[in-house]
Swiss-Prot record:
Keywords: Endoplasmic reticulum, Glycoprotein, Glycosyltransferase, GPI-anchor biosynthesis, Membrane, Transferase, Transmembrane, Transmembrane helix
Gene label: gpi10
Annotated function: Mannosyltransferase involved in glycosylphosphatidylinositol-anchor biosynthesis. Transfers the third mannose to Man2-GlcN-acyl-PI during GPI precursor assembly.
One MF annotation (Gene Ontology) recorded for this entry: alpha-1,2-mannosyltransferase activity
Glycosylated residues in this chain: 115, 395
Cystine connections: none
Name used for this protein in its record: GPI mannosyltransferase 3
Amino acid sequence: MRIWFWLAILVFRWWNALWVKTFFQPDEFYQSLEVAHHFIFRYGFLTWEWTSAIRSALHPLIFAALYRVLQVLKLDSSYFVFTNAPKLLQGTFAAILDYGTYKFALVRYGSKTANWTLACSLVSIMNAYVGVRTFSNSLETTLTSIGFYYFSYYLKYENSSPEQRKKAYSSLLGFISVAAFACFIRPTNILVWIFPLLFWNKNPQTPIKDLLSFSNVFNRFRFLYALGYGRLFGIFVLCVSLFLVNIIADRILYGRFVFPIISFFQFNVTSGLSSLYGLNAWHYYLSQALPLICGGFLPFVLLTMDLQTAGTILCVFFPYSLIGHKELRFVYPISPILLTLAGKFFSSFSSWKRAARFFFLIGLGHALVITFLCRFHQFGVMEVMPLIHSLAEKNQTGLILAPCHTTPWQSHIHSPFAENGWKFLTCEPFEKPFDETDRFYENMPTFLDKIKEWPDYLIFFEERFYSLYSYLDSRGLKYEEVQRYYNSLIPESRERAGALLVYKKL
């Protein structure tokens, strides 16, 4: 495809990223932008994961570099530029995800399937709603799509003539690079590659007896040995360089030598502490995550599912299902291979018009869901941020009485005054006996009685209105409503019901 076409997709994803006006999950900010902001500007809120060195520095340092550029150019003083620049960068990563998914399908299934796969990627609910957000999972998915492309290109020349092994070798180096970075950012990304590395070959329709045979695995490693023989030094240098980059990145952010992958494994696997963030049914990834990732393409994905893709999904879903805490975005990196199956289904139609009709109906349904999620669901908690920014700039104090991390923080306030002048309820997992959020909702009067100096502004959800109004009145505190923001038709929890209210002290 011509370069202008890919530039158009880049512009589309930029628009997509800027068009999103809603909140999804706190990690979009507190595991990326907030960390980057703290690193560059030396103020902001660091969650326990960063004070305990449980996460890789690679992802937030990307946005830290962007913030540094804005700082040097003195563009960070513009609230519009400061809050939208990260969106444009993430939109670029989302466009690369579209490109990587297309290239993977092109090598794996051919041009017709690749064209349909790209179309599916462009109307994917997950790509439009999650892919343009600054989650580490989003960048992980982008890297995974490129990794699948390089690995499929490698398979194409596996067992080839000596003259063509140079192509296989260069593809292998590309695969090692992007897969390593994906695993550094999210160590669990290794699950995506277990089955492909052992069993995939260039023919997706290989029978199960041949696919899982010992000879298939033996031939894979025999070719890798033949390919690497005489080139081991180059592979060794690449691997060492990648590890050094990761170690140096962690050293830069944390200020000391740390190994986040060890802490990450201990917290999420051996300790079981991840369950503090909620428990899900063992079948969550099959019964909920898979349908949500595929959307309207789910029946077609299941109809065209081959053994190599099914094995890959199983190797991802099974280990994740053993952990009590589950989230949709954890398995987002498998979306490129699922979208290629949807593209394969549409390419199987003998009539292009019939395939286009099917696609149009599904795309229309996806567009409605995307519009609801990106423009209406959890809208108010983002819409209030410019107001908080302007109040902090005027040295007005405030307190957000809502579940922890309901809003972004300094990545959307960007005010040194707010560091002490504004507060929100925390929920660090090691707070005893309960975290601030629990204490507030368990016994609101007792919690509020400990406030020595009441702030200029209170922000809370409508569900808290009557109890909070009664408390303020009983204490002789006078506040009046100055703003209310619609938040969601379907609240994420009882504590988030109703509009988001802003009250000013009289």
